[in-house]
């Protein structure tokens, strides 16, 4: 978890001094999975955002639309695919965990397709839940249930967050897996617990990409790769993009940071497909570092959720504006006018 940020901080810039220093960058645009974005970053998928603020993913989609950047909806959203689609005004993607197994996954894919998602993002690194010790300490489990036991275990956290408590109470402490609503398997409607069970029993494999490709008419992207051999396998499978990610360090502690993995994967995959990265992105300068190392764009995870928790939709909008402004400022100080001028020659790695 810590290495995602630590490895970003090890990178230092080598600016080009001259006539371009301080001049407004003329081109911060990027084509990401075939859609134009005014800036080289997007909102990444985060589960249970409704537990942070009642606005949840709807607020995130609205904020992304204001800036014109893509938004990726998590299967673990507290709002339905259709609710988020109605709020989105920029291209949006759907991140797939096959809740309910293959049958449930097919239903979610069909709904996302009908609602207008342009890209299907299949997360490959969650074959079993990670051992998240903090969650275990305060009794968190899936699906989220707020009762006397969980409130007691979380009391020391809640008592210092009166604004959060007020918002959650007004939302009646609803943290649902909204996209399992109405899901069926073998003709029977599934409860949330059952949908989760079948996902764990039938996690996605490389072979599943075949039927997903047959059902999905848009871009097919795999997320959660940190191994160069897996990147080659993804290319062989015919994917349209790769998201380099160690799941925020929340799955397997000793995986390399996303940035370190990007160094290995980008040279292999970026000549063929768009390569994105997430993990530790907190500043616009972090986005620029990722672009210098071959990423097409970066995804925000915790950063946008911090804004959501602090101020709902307006909080997310403010975070996106901060990231955008920092990208522009960093480019000015580096002496580049276009995203296309960013490369490894502008970076050096601290030796410690």
Tell where the protein language model's regions lie, with residue ranges:
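Alpha-helix-loop-beta-strand connector modules within alpha/beta enzyme cores
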Residues: 82-93, 201-220, 253-277, 322-330
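Glycine-rich beta-to-alpha transition loops that act as phosphate-gripper elements at the mouths
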Residues: 55, 75-78, 99, 203, ...
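N-terminal capping/small domains of soluble enzymes
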Residues: 1-128, 323-325, 342-351
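Hydrophobic faces of well-ordered beta-strands that scaffold small-molecule active sites
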Residues: 41-44, 71-73, 92-96, 120, ...
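Glycine-enriched alpha-helix->loop->beta-strand junction motifs that scaffold or abut catalytic
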Residues: 66-70, 86-92, 115-118, 215-219, ...
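Conserved, mostly hydrophobic/aromatic
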Residues: 43, 64, 122, 212, ...
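Alpha/beta catalytic cores of nucleotide-metabolism and tRNA/nucleoside-modifying enzymes
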Residues: 1, 6-9, 257-277, 282-352
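An N-cap/entry alpha-helix motif that binds or orients negatively charged groups
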Residues: 1-34, 139, 143-146, 151-204, ...
